């Protein structure tokens, strides 16, 4: 009987329905302190102020708790990338640079989510809901890469959009993980992580022969204007004399 009393005492102050959120927040705090692999299920319970048995009401194990955090992270990540991409406005290169900067901003401002998403060691296909959230976020990068691939000059071999998406994702992830998370122990840079990533992307695109000027893509030409009724037609050199 005594352990039930202890459990009730430990959970005092938690109303029905918010224990799950308390556990998620506790896990985020622990990730910030110890990393995604540095805490146990019991640690999360202790941080939330509940008994070791309480988390099992909402999560099968620690991996399921981490998967739930990673899923939320990918949902926030998708929203941020979508806003940054803005359907490629005002031009593809500028919009893509915004996506890269959004990637770095997420890693810097949401380090616990970022760690759960990319450093927890969870198998990507073990949780269908998590996998779907991850794919939706990556779809933004792939859509942007498809627009970049379409910029290939005529007659030049066009790399597969998926390959370009993976290349540029690797660049963004590398800069974010190595330099962009505000960790004082990480190597100092003589430039901002955003400037480093922008230079990498431009060098990559120019190496492929892509134009990298920031001009809006031309719109399809419409029919020529109709001259006023009774007026002689004008050619490319003006009105004939």
PLM feature spans:
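Short secondary-structure transition hinges
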Residues: 109-143, 185-190
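Helix-turn-helix
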Residues: 22, 26, 30-64, 68
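N-terminal intrinsically disordered/low-complexity leader segments
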Residues: 1-18, 212-241
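Short hydrophobic clusters on alpha-helical segments that form packing/core surfaces
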Residues: 23-31, 73, 77, 103
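Amphipathic alpha-helical packing segments from all-alpha helical-bundle domains
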Residues: 82, 125-151, 162-166, 195-206
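Hydrophobic alpha-helical connector segments
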Residues: 82-112, 135, 154-168
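Amphipathic alpha-helical linker/stalk segments
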Residues: 72-96, 118, 128, 132-139, ...
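Amphipathic C-terminal alpha-helical segment
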Residues: 147, 166-187, 203-214
